[in-house]
């Protein structure tokens, strides 16, 4: 399996509770390397662009409001099969359905405030990384 990169966000519920280090520990324990990372406060425009795929969903407004409610940590993760591996480490979107040992099982507050984002495919990973990082900010 090839080395891949995926895009990750530690969401406002994680920065608010000061658990970004605890989440990073789970990421690293899974064998993923944090090859880029910065703390930002997303603008409404950035959040709307990022989640444009969900703009017709009933929770879109709530999701954008949440993502701009506080700072986030955006990251690029690198490793073998990184996209699927990180989805496994994150756990199910709804923390009540997330498996033991996953980030969302351990830390998520609700289906909306669920601590982390991870890309779902190589195409979306490339688009999401490029939205937030220049090439020279990623150091593998
Ligand atoms: P995932 O983040 O697991 O890929 P989705 O892409 O389906 O999940 O949804 C994007 C984000 O929208 C979720 O992580 C969550 O923050 C939010 N969300 C999804 N479903 C709901 C819902 N039913 N109610 C509120 N927020 C939701
Ligand atoms: Mg998704």
Swiss-Prot record:
* A single Gene Ontology CC term: cytoplasm
What top-level branch of life does the organism fall under? Answer: Bacteria
State a single Gene Ontology molecular function. Answer: metal ion binding
Cofactor dependence: Mg(2+)
Q: What class of enzyme is it?
A: transferase
Gene3D superfamilies the UniProt entry points to: Nucleoside diphosphate kinase-like domain (3.30.70.141)
Catalytic activity, reaction form = a 2'-deoxyribonucleoside 5'-diphosphate + ATP = a 2'-deoxyribonucleoside 5'-triphosphate + ADP; a ribonucleoside 5'-diphosphate + ATP = a ribonucleoside 5'-triphosphate + ADP
InterPro entries, per the entry: NDK-like_dom, NDK-like_dom_sf, Nucleoside_diP_kinase, Nucleoside_diP_kinase_AS
A Pfam family name for this chain? NDK
Q: Where would you find this protein in the cell? A: Cytoplasm
Keywords assigned by UniProt, alphabetized = ATP-binding, Cytoplasm, Kinase, Magnesium, Metal-binding, Nucleotide metabolism, Nucleotide-binding, Phosphoprotein, Transferase
Quote the SUPFAM superfamilies the UniProt record gives: Nucleoside diphosphate kinase, NDK
Please state the Enzyme Commission number of this protein.
2.7.4.6
| GO biological process, alphabetically ordered | CTP biosynthetic process; GTP biosynthetic process; UTP biosynthetic process
Q: Enumerate the active-site residues.
A: 117
Residues that hold ATP according to the record = 11, 59, 87, 93, 104, 114
Sum up the protein's function in the record's words: Major role in the synthesis of nucleoside triphosphates other than ATP. The ATP gamma phosphate is transferred to the NDP beta phosphate via a ping-pong mechanism, using a phosphorylated active-site intermediate.
The subunit structure is: Homotetramer.
Protein family according to the UniProt entry:
Belongs to the NDK family.
Q: By what name is this protein known? A: Nucleoside diphosphate kinase
Source organism per entry reads Rhodopseudomonas palustris (strain BisB5)
Native organism taxonomy? Bacteria, Pseudomonadati, Pseudomonadota, Alphaproteobacteria, Hyphomicrobiales
Q: Which gene encodes it?
A: ndk
């Amino acid at each position: 399996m090839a080395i891949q990169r995926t895009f990750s966000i530690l969401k406002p519920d994680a920065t608010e509770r000061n658990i970004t280090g605890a989440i990073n520990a789970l990421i690293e324990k899974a064998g993923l390397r944090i090859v880029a990372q910065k703390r930002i406060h997303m603008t409404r425009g950035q959040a709307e662009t990022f989640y444009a795929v969900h703009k017709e969903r009933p929770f879109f407004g709530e999701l954008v409001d949440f993502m701009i409610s506080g700072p986030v940590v955006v990251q690029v993760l690198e490793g073998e099969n990184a996209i699927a591996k990180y989805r496994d480490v994150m756990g199910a979107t709804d923390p009540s359905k997330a498996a033991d040992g996953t980030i969302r099982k351990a830390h998520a507050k609700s289906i909306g405030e669920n601590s982390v984002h991870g890309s779902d495919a190589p195409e979306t990973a490339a688009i999401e990384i490029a939205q937030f990082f220049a090439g020279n900010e990623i150091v593998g």
